[in-house]
From Swiss-Prot:
Annotated RCK N-terminal domain residues: 400-519
Protein's organism: Salmonella typhimurium (strain LT2 / SGSC1412 / ATCC 700720)
Protein name: Glutathione-regulated potassium-efflux system protein KefB
Domain of life from the UniProt record: Bacteria
Function: Pore-forming subunit of a potassium efflux system that confers protection against electrophiles. Catalyzes K(+)/H(+) antiport.
PANTHER family per UniProt: K(+) EFFLUX ANTIPORTER 3, CHLOROPLASTIC
Bilayer topology term: Multi-pass membrane protein
NCBIfam families named in the record: 2a37, PRK03659.1
Positions of transmembrane segments: 4-24, 29-49, 55-75, 87-107, 111-131, 152-172, 177-197, 207-227, 230-250, 262-282, 284-304, 324-344, 356-376
Subunit record text: Interacts with the regulatory subunit KefG.
GO terms (BP aspect): proton transmembrane transport
Alphabetized Pfam families for the sequence: Na_H_Exchanger, TrkA_N
GO cellular component terms listed in the entry, alphabetical order: plasma membrane
């Protein structure tokens, strides 16, 4: 595909995404399923606009690659070491158990035992792209079940290497003498990548950042991700695993957040392209001729994987309320199956339509996951939010609250407790099941649900409430909720939590003026106490704190247009010098006006 064809394909992809995803969101089936349906519509078995599916599918894997890089940035080597038990324990158990059961069933379906083994391994894998996307949408990424799900996915990526090596052995086409030299060279190259990345990446990015040109920094980030993916692909290893390692190596660097901001737009677009490509690969001809076989295989695949994952989650000690989410989010087949089954087909392991049937099963299983998650979400909402008696009441009670608090983590808890202590009527919404269960045991009225859903806000009393306090962990959720409230509940007074200056800029641009930066107030208070401990008069220290807060807020507002540009660094330095000059002038005047005011606690 080249030239005008490539441009036409790009336009078709963008049109399909723009048309299908908002429609899917309106229907409440999620963006992922919208992308899949869009792919079916424009693919060879739909309207037939695009026929070269394999090439596009390979290119669109870059979406998964970028996603794994960002996941790597959110971890560090010490955190990865802490997850070793769940990665090599639960992850290995899931792959082996699921593969064994599924391989046995494929043998009963007249697959050769070699093809059944490959089929079982391929079907045992889950979709990294879909699972991580859904976990983020459902707020699972910070929960115990989300961490366990990520560990299982990471082991599956590691299992790609031996699984691909197993195919020629099963086909009987492996070299008589195993080439240990090639294996040793791959291991050596992998080690060089790790060591080189460990000691070279930070100095290189420090040099690039010194240029002050954001575009160059973005280009360098893309170069790193694509080079790591290409290098791992040349070694015959998982591209996603390579970029994940690159992300982990940079997780503790000072450029972590800038790297994430540079990659995020590309990740979203390419992930959408990946799901559209998967939808295009669905062979409707095979589905039509083997409808009962495919339908049964999809149900069996999802049920077996859910049962296996649920059992492992129980053995691992995951809360009962989180096990169903964990089991369902990993219940589908994954993108790795396309690679493994294609390799097996080239070795003539499959007969007739067997490969096509397996690929259709994988694709349809991916389409069931968003619907399954939606159903489980509703079931959990009714179960967790329902009254003690089995009477008919809404799944979130509208108690005519004055305030709706979104998020009941450490930040949200303090706000909610203060409001309740002052007899304010509040409703708390939280999508971490574990937190909901724990807080309800202590008597807090906390409801489970995703506050970015309009109907949940409406049933929680948003139409009658006076204010909403947004304390989400993820800035994306905060901004989405702000836009939602401004559109559907414009009367609400919005107050929000900002993790840092970038989030504060975004809130100001969205028209939210009442916000609190996560550590700013506590840091100022500790700074005031430090000034007093160094001999400054308590009243003078208090005034210094107030001056600093006021001038820092002014600087924050002045830098709004530049918040996404590296020019902000020089602007911030100028503002800091101005702040110091004003501060010194005011403090000199303050020293002449001190009275006998003393500190009190």
């Amino acid at each position: 595909m080249e030239g005008a064809d490539l441009l036409t394909a790009g336009v078709l992809f963008l049109f399909a995404a723009v048309a299908a995803v908002p429609l899917a969101a309106r229907l409440g089936i999620g963006a992922v399923l919208g992308y899949l349906l869009a792919g079916i519509a424009i693919g060879p078995w739909g309207l037939g606009f695009i026929s070269d599916v394999d090439e596009i599918l390979h290119f669109s894997e870059l979406g998964v690659v970028f996603l794994m890089f960002i996941i790597g940035l959110e971890l560090n080597p010490s955190r990865l070491w802490q997850l070793r038990r769940s990665i090599f324990g639960v992850g290995a158990a899931q792959v082996l158990l699921s593969a064994a059961v599924l391989a046995g069933l494929l043998m009963l379906a007249d697959f050769l035992w070699q093809a059944a083994v490959v089929g079982g391994i391929g079907l045992a894998m889950s979709s990294t792209a879909m699972a991580l996307q859904l976990m983020r949408e459902k707020g699972m990424n910070r929960s115990e079940s989300g961490q366990l799900g990520f560990s299982v996915l990471l082991f599956q990526d590691l299992a790609v290497i031996p699984a691909l090596a197993l195919v020629p052995l099963l086909a009987g086409s492996a070299d008589e003498h195993f080439d240990w030299f090639k294996v040793a060279m791959k291991v050596l190259a992998f080690a060089v990548m790790l060591i080189g990345g460990r000691y070279l990446l930070r100095p290189v990015f420090r040099f690039i950042a010194a240029s002050g040109v954001r575009e160059v920094f973005t280009a360098a980030t893309l170069l790193l991700v694509l080079s790591a993916a290409l290098f791992m692909d040349a070694l015959g290893l998982s591209m996603a695993l390579g970029t994940f390692i690159a992300g982990v190596l940079l997780a503790e660097s000072e450029y972590r957040h800038e790297l994430e901001n540079a990659i995020d737009p590309f990740k979203g677009l390419l992930l959408g392209l990946f799901f559209i490509s998967v939808g295009m690969s669905l062979n409707l001809g095979v589905l039509y001729t083997h409808l009962l076989w495919v339908a049964a295989s999809v149900v069996i695949l999802v049920v077996i994987k859910m049962l296996t994952l649920y059992l492992l989650a129980r053995l691992y000690g995951i809360r009962s309320s989180e096990r169903m989410q964990f089991a369902s989010v990993l219940s589908q087949g994954g993108e790795f199956a396309f690679v493994l089954f294609s390799t097996a087909s080239s070795q003539r392991l499959f007969q007739g339509d067997q490969m096509a049937l397996l690929l259709v099963t994988v694709t349809l299983s991916m389409m069931t996951t968003p619907l399954l998650m939606k159903g489980i979400d509703k079931w959990l909402s009714r179960r967790l939010n329902g009254p003690e008696e089995n009477d008919e009441k809404p799944w979130v009670e509208d108690d005519k609250p004055q305030v709706i608090v979104v998020g009941f983590g450490r930040f949200g808890q303090v706000i909610a407790r203060l409001l309740m202590a002052n007899k304010m009527r509040i409703t708390v919404l939280e999508r971490d099941i574990g937190a909901v269960n724990l807080m309800r045991k202590y008597g807090y009225k906390v409801y489970y649900g995703d506050a970015t859903q309009v109907e949940l806000l409406r049933s929680a009393g948003a139409e009658a409430a006076e204010s909403i306090v947004i304390t989400c962990n993820e800035p994306e959720d905060t901004m989405k909720l702000v836009a939602l409230c401004q559109q559907h509940f414009p009367h609400l007074h919005i107050l929000a939590r900002a993790r840092g200056r970038v989030e504060a800029h975004e809130l100001l641009q969205a028209g939210v003026t009442q916000f609190s930066r996560e550590t700013f107030s506590s840091a100022l208070e500790l700074g005031r106490k430090t000034l007093v401990s160094l001999g400054m008069h308590p009243h003078q220290a208090q005034r210094a704190q107030l001056h600093f807060r006021r001038l820092d807020m002014r600087m924050l507002r002045e830098l709004i247009p530049e918040h996404s540009d590296m020019v902000q660094i020089s602007r911030a330095r100028e503002a800091r010098r101005e702040l110091e000059e004003i501060f010194q002038r005011e403090m000199q005047q303050e020293r002449r006006q001190l009275d006998g005011w003393d500190e009190f606690e």
